[in-house]
Amino acid sequence: MTDSKIHLVLIGGINNSAIVWDEFALHSPPWLELHRRVCPALDNVNDIAAVLLDDLPEEFYLCGFSFGGYVSLAILAVAKHRIKGLILANTQDGADSPGQTIFRQKSLQIASEGGYEKLVAGQADIVFHPDSA
C-alpha cells in the first residue's frame, strides 16, 4: 500500500514550540500530513538536524521557520534524496551579516542577564501577524 498523503515537515525557530504552526494546521488540506518538530537544545546545527532526521518520513517537503531554516539547510545537506522541496520562512540561506551577528550577540547578553522573556515578547510583533496573538 502506498502512502497517498504528502508529508510536510515544519521546523520552528529556536524560541518556538510546535504551537507556531497551529493556525497553519487549521487551514491545511486533508491530504497534507504535517510533521511539526521542535529543535532540541544541542550546540551544533548539524547535530540538531541529525536528531530530527532520524524520525522523519522517507520523502517529504521541508519548511524551516527562522532558526528552523538553518536546521532545514543542514538536513538538506545530508538527506537531499529524501527532500522533495524546501521552504524557508523568515530565514536566509547564508551566514549572518555583521549587523545580524551584533544583534544576536546583544540578544544573548540580554537573555543571559535575565531578560529572555522580554526579548522574546519584543520580537513577537515583528515576526508574527497580529491575528496570531
For every predicted segment, state its role.
Residues 44-46, 92-99, 130-131:
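A short beta-to-alpha transition loop/helix N-cap that caps and shapes the active-site region
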Residues 64-68, 72:
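Gly/Ala-rich beta-loop-alpha elbow adjacent to hydrolase catalytic centers
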Residues 62-64, 89:
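Short beta-strand immediately N-terminal to the catalytic nucleophile in serine-hydrolase-like folds
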Residues 2-46, 50-51:
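Conserved HGGG/HGGXW glycine-rich cap/lid loop of the alpha/beta-hydrolase fold
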Residues 77-78, 82-120:
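Flexible "cap/lid" loop of the alpha/beta hydrolase fold
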Residues 4, 56-58, 81:
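Active-site acidic short loop of glycosyltransferases
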Residues 23, 74-78:
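Active-site signature of alpha/beta-hydrolase-fold catalytic machinery across serine-
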Residues 124-128:
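Active-site rim beta-loop-alpha module in soluble metabolic enzymes
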